Regions:
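Short polar catalytic/cofactor-binding loops
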Residues: 7-14
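Catalytic domains of carbohydrate-active enzymes, especially glycoside hydrolases
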Residues: 16-39, 112-116
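A short glycine/small-residue-enriched secondary-structure motif
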Residues: 37-41, 75-79, 83-84
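Bimodal feature
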Residues: 15-16, 125
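Hydrophobic faces of well-ordered beta-strands that scaffold small-molecule active sites
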Residues: 3-7, 31-33, 77-82, 117-119, ...
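Glycine-rich, proline-tolerant flexible connector loops at the mouths of alpha/beta enzymes
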Residues: 32-66, 124-128
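Conserved protein kinase catalytic core
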Residues: 12, 38-40, 85-87, 167-168
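Active-site acidic/histidine proton-transfer and metal-coordination neighborhood
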Residues: 64-65, 69-72, 76, 86-173
C-alpha cells in the first residue's frame, strides 16, 4: 500500500522541489498534485487563469520541475487534482477558459507520468444563484466529453470528485 497526500499547502508555500522533500521526509510515498493551488476560486470566476495553463514556457518549467523533484525525492505523482470550479453559471467565456485549463491539466498529468486526474463535476453550490441538477448534469457531460480526446492522447484516466449536492430550486439534496 502506498500512502499519498495532497501537495497543498507544501508546494504553494515552498515550491515543488522543497515541497516534495518535506512530503517525503514526513513519510509519504506519493502525492495528489493540486493544480487548483495555482488559482483561486475567484480567479476562475474572473477568467484569471494562471500562466501555467496559458504560457508554454511556464508550463514546461512546471513539468520539468515535477519530473525532476519526483525522481530526486522518490515521490510518486499518484494523481493530480484539476482546478476548481470546472463550471460557472452564466459565464460562458469563463467556462471556455476553464475547459482549456482542464485540458492542460490532462496534458501535464500525462507528461509527468501520472495516470489519474481528479476533475470536479459542474457544481454551483450557490443558494444565491441557483441551478438545477439537470443543468449541472448537462454541463458535466459536455465538459467530460470534451476532455476525452486529451485523456486518450495522454493516457490519463479522469476520476470524478465526489461533491456534496443540493438542488437549490427544489431544496432537495
Amino acid at each position: 500500500m502506498k500512502i499519498c497526500v495532497q501537495t497543498n499547502p507544501m508546494v504553494p508555500r515552498y515550491g515543488v522541489d522543497k515541497g516534495f522533500e518535506i512530503i517525503k521526509a514526513a513519510g509519504f510515498d506519493g502525492v495528489d498534485f493540486n493544480f487548483d493551488s495555482y488559482c483561486t476560486y475567484n480567479d476562475m470566476i474572473e477568467c484569471k487563469i494562471p500562466d501555467i495553463f496559458t504560457d508554454e514556457a511556464k508550463k514546461e518549467a512546471l513539468i520539468e520541475d515535477m519530473i525532476a523533484s519526483s525522481k530526486k525525492h522518490g515521490i510518486e505523482i499518484h494523481q493530480c487534482h484539476a482546478p476548481f470550479p470546472s463550471y460557472i453559471k452564466d459565464k460562458p467565456e469563463a467556462n471556455k477558459t476553464i475547459l482549456e485549463a482542464l485540458k492542460v491539466s490532462v496534458e501535464i498529468c500525462g507528461r509527468v507520468g501520472c495516470k489519474i486526474l481528479v476533475v470536479h463535476p459542474a457544481f454551483n453550490g450557490s443558494a444565491r444563484y441557483p441551478t438545477r441538477r439537470s443543468e449541472e448534469w448537462q454541463w458535466s457531460m459536455d465538459m467530460y466529453t470534451a476532455l476525452i480526446p486529451s485523456l486518450k492522447k495522454y493516457g490519463v484516466t479522469c476520476c470524478l470528485e465526489n461533491m456534496w449536492g443540493q438542488d437549490w430550486i427544489t431544496k432537495k439534496i
